[in-house]
């Protein structure tokens, strides 16, 4: 058993497991990535998403991730995963920029983020820029939202909703594009400076179309809730 205690300067907040086994065809990697903790107590209270795959692209990235953990190396040398502190925020900002450009070109566009809180100044300013360009943005934020929707000239194309119920909304989902062609990512990282700049976090794409539709269907149901859903108003009330 080799225990790696992580980084001195960064909190490890990612949730990843990689099992390597020998088969008749060679080495196989079974990779699990999650939005929630490996904690038997909070697992009974939190709602999260877990992804398990034998795709070797994920396996190679997971192997590289654990190698970097042992070396205290904040590398960005990954094929498919985004790893904070170097990649997640820049890739989110680039994804928002891409939707702004699509709007300017008259193409279908849109943005969706599900997060526990949104406090990062860079991301908020970029979302405001997207709204000013006319991109519709939906933010599913259970906790703190430092962006106020519906402000003329700034956030009139931003919608912020929250669900607080018996179980804690804990999954993080990023969506870039219109509903029928949205690129979906799952992540351990909230849209907070501490998560994206000061922690080791992972975000990864949902490439399987069936899984993508399951996630979008789950979000459709959540956003149509008529009992627990609350919407943030321009005056700060819900």
Question: What do these predicted regions represent?
Answer:
Residues 44-47:
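Acidic/polar active-site rim loop that often engages polyanionic ligands
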Residues 55-76, 90-94:
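Short, compositionally biased "basic patch" segments
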């Amino acid at each position: 058993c080799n225990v790696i205690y992580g980084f001195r300067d960064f909190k490890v907040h990612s949730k990843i497991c990689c099992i390597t086994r020998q088969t008749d065809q060679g080495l196989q990697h079974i990779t699990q990535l999650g939005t929630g903790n490996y904690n038997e107590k909070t697992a009974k209270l939190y709602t999260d998403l877990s992804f398990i795959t034998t795709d070797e692209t994920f396996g190679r990235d997971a192997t590289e991730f654990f190698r970097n953990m042992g070396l205290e190396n904040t590398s960005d040398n990954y094929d498919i995963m985004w790893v904070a502190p170097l990649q997640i925020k820049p890739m989110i900002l680039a994804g928002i920029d891409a939707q702004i450009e699509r709007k300017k070109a008259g193409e279908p566009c849109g943005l969706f983020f599900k997060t526990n809180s949104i406090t990062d100044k860079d991301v908020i300013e970029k979302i405001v820029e997207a709204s000013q360009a006319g991109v519709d943005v939906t933010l599913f934020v259970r906790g703190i939202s430092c962006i106020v929707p519906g402000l003329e000239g700034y956030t009139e194309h931003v919608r912020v909703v929250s669900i607080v119920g018996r179980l804690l909304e804990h999954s993080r989902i990023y969506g870039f594009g219109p509903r029928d062609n949205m690129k979906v990512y799952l992540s351990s990282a909230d849209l907070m400076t501490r998560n994206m700049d000061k922690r080791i976090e992972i975000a990864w794409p949902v490439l399987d179309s069936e899984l993508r539709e399951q996630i979008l269907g789950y979000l459709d149901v959540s956003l149509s809730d008529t009992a627990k859903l609350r919407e943030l108003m321009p005056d700060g009330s819900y």
